[in-house]
Amino acid sequence: MNLILTLLINTLLSSVLVLIAFWLPQLNIYTEKSSPYECGFDPMVSARLPFSMKFFLVAITFLLFDLEIALLLPLPWASQTTNLKTMLTMALILISLLAASLAYEWTQKGLEWTE
């Protein structure tokens, strides 16, 4: 009963906070807040610089590979367990997934900076 009550209160509280976060910014809509400010003058150039999509994709790829490698770090301690076959199977699956994703990135030309 306590678990259900706690989950219900947490769900209700988080839903209320999300709804408040969506409704409050819509009450104060000012065009001045969304425009670039340059000392009261009209802007000389656009303040919205284009972002390189290639850089973004390389950064996301780095984060994914970094997380997968972080999963490999506990393997030396896991090798001391009694169930060595399961540990080796999981390590092989993880390394295979890492190699397959690297091969996919390579074939899709995701690792080449210049086009």
Curated annotation (Swiss-Prot):
Reaction(s) catalysed by this chain, per the record, are: a ubiquinone + NADH + 5 H(+)(in) = a ubiquinol + NAD(+) + 4 H(+)(out)
Q: Which GO terms describe its molecular function?
A: NADH dehydrogenase (ubiquinone) activity
Q: Which residues form a coiled coil?
A: none
Annotated TM spans: 3-23, 55-75, 86-106
Compartmental location: Mitochondrion inner membrane
EC? 7.1.1.2
Q: Which GO terms describe its cellular component?
A: mitochondrial inner membrane; NADH dehydrogenase complex
Name the InterPro entries for this protein.
NADH_UbQ/plastoQ_OxRdtase_su3, NDAH_ubi_oxred_su3_sf
- Topological relation to the membrane, as annotated: Multi-pass membrane protein
Question: Could you give a single Gene Ontology term from the biological process aspect?
Answer: mitochondrial electron transport, NADH to ubiquinone
The alphabetical list of record keywords is:
Electron transport, Membrane, Mitochondrion, Mitochondrion inner membrane, NAD, Respiratory chain, Translocase, Transmembrane, Transmembrane helix, Transport, Ubiquinone
Q: How does it assemble?
A: Core subunit of respiratory chain NADH dehydrogenase (Complex I) which is composed of 45 different subunits. Interacts with TMEM186. Interacts with TMEM242.
Describe the family membership recorded for this protein in Swiss-Prot or TrEMBL: Belongs to the complex I subunit 3 family.
Role according to the record = Core subunit of the mitochondrial membrane respiratory chain NADH dehydrogenase (Complex I) which catalyzes electron transfer from NADH through the respiratory chain, using ubiquinone as an electron acceptor. Essential for the catalytic activity of complex I.
Q: Per its record, how is this protein called by name?
A: NADH-ubiquinone oxidoreductase chain 3
